[in-house]
Amino acid sequence: MEMKQYEVIVVGGGHGGVEASLAAARLGKKAAMFTLYLDTIAMMSCNPSIGGPGKSNLVAEMDILGGEMGRHTDKFNLQLKHLNESKGPAARITRGQADKYLYRTEMRKLLEHTDNLEIIQDCVDEIIVEDGKVKGIITRLGIKYYAQCVVLATGTFLKGKIVIGDVAYSAGRQGENSAEKLSDSLREHGITIERYQTATPPRLDKRSIDFSKMKELKGEEHPRYFSIFTDKERNNVVPTWLTYTTEKTIEVAKEMLQYSPIVSGIIKTHGPRHCPSLDRKVINFPDKSNHQIFLELESAESEEVYVNGLTTAMPPFAQEAMMRTIAGLENARVMRYGYAVEYDYAPAAQLYPSLESKKVEGLYFAGQINGTSGYEEAACQGFIAGVNAARKADGKEPVIIDRSEGYIGVLIDDIIHKKTPEPYRVLPSRSEYRLTLRFDNAFMRLFTKAKEIGILSSEKLDYLENSIKIVNDEIARLKEISVPMVQANALLEKLGSDQKLTKGVKIGDLLKIKEVTYDSLKDITEISDYPGFIKNQIETMIKYEIFIQRENEQIEKFKRLEEVRIPADFDFSEVKGISNIARCGLEEIKPLSIGEASRISGVTGNDIALLVGYLK
């Protein structure tokens, strides 16, 4: 058989694998994606949602850098909804409910029509390693495929085990085979493997649900899209519905806990803390009875409904008994029962910030194999891994996004340096620079990285560069124009503001007043009809200028610590006085800067002072 040679191989066809494959191929590399089943490429295994606090920021950042998830969700969704509009700009986001069927079928179509990319259905059993460098893979069919770099985005399929009640069987997703040999191959090459667990709720037949007993929640006809390149006049407004558990639900759940695999001990691994099962909610909050339950249609092409909030791996009879106590679900028919899945993963402390393995050169990891949870988390890691695999194949330095530049950087930095006892989910609270890393300003802060990566077309880069110039020029103009007191007060009165000015003011300062919007300035100065994302940016940067400046000062301090480099072969045992726990963490992670060292669990300020003193 002819030798099969590629530049980048991607193992896995989920959200991480999709972004990695597209990134490598779009950068001109001959790439191959391996998937267990062609028909489940880009499958949304759990909820139909894209976005959420922190997650939406990841999607927006990928969009600016050249990723696909944002624009694909804009095209193939059932609704987009604005969240946290009453809060500050750091919290405002868009959340999408994707059409799960169209999302995956159209993504497969996109992949099949992407130049430089081949898609192959087969199970990868081994990685080929020579002299500490990855050389390719071996599949279940015994075929060897060679490549300069390999990206592993295996999801929940490494020794995956499905659990429903007291029933357990091997599968990476319900109805699909697991990959039983690959994690053993990784162990053979010095990579540590551990296990996590995640779970999903039952799916119901829409025709059996009484929606009249629930609150209907519609999306926005004219939303902020995930991608600023999306040109769409009107969006779908297919509703979701809200209901609640009751005291009877909790009573039944408590009776059924004896059958829960997390109580019986069948499941011993940890699941995502921020997406707990109903079993876990009842155990942790036994006195709370009204947990929210959202009913979300999975696709316009099916009658299947996702029951968000009722995640459980209890046996089928227990799932049905609990559902019967919820308003609107009294007669609901189950199409798929909820289940848990346990799987192997490789703790991300074994990676560089490029997502390349420290143990095997040219081997990259992305998504749940790194101990993360969520489509968006997997996708952004896949994108970065795919970009850096392509760059390594070209002999280029990796692209690194640090935690002051994006939530992508926060996620990667956290999973490498801060081990958690459960799958990692990105959250705004994990970032020190939330006001800087807003959902609405990814185009401002990541434009330089987008140019460096080189996936976006010259037309899109020009559009971004021009948009940034408009924002900066307009802010400077508004800060220079004065408006008389009488005219300014007339505008404030018209807008319902209680504030009264005692002298004239610059328009930039007037815009800082709560009730004043950029569009309302048309009464006192000439303004242009810029796209909404530009007007929003002008307004936010002026209104929150002092807070943004304070955060920028913190970022400068962070950057200075990042600039103090630590040699790659540095021997931390030479530094006297460092605590044992710090030394263990430093030797495991092998940080490349003082800033990175300071974020390792167990490393104190005193340890950093000793390290800095030694390096000087």
Where would I find each of the regions flagged by the language model?
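Beta1/beta-strand and adjacent pyrophosphate-binding region of the FAD-binding site
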Residues: K4-G16
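Core beta-strand elements of the Rossmann-like FAD/NAD(P) dinucleotide-binding domain
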Residues: K4-Y6, R140-C149
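Short hydrophobic core segments
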Residues: V11, K144-G155
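Conserved N-terminal/central alpha/beta ligand/cofactor-binding core
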Residues: L22-E126, L141, A153-R173, N177-S183, ...
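An anion/pyrophosphate-binding glycine-rich loop and adjacent beta-alpha core
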Residues: D39, S183-E320, G328, I408, ...
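Conserved beta-strand-loop-beta-strand element in the redox core of flavoprotein oxidoreductases
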Residues: I128-K144
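A glycine-rich dinucleotide-binding beta-alpha-beta segment and adjacent secondary-structure elements
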Residues: Y306-T372, I400-D413, P531-G585, K590
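Extended, charge-enriched "interface" segments that sit outside catalytic cores
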Residues: R430, F447-E452, L456-D607, G613-L615
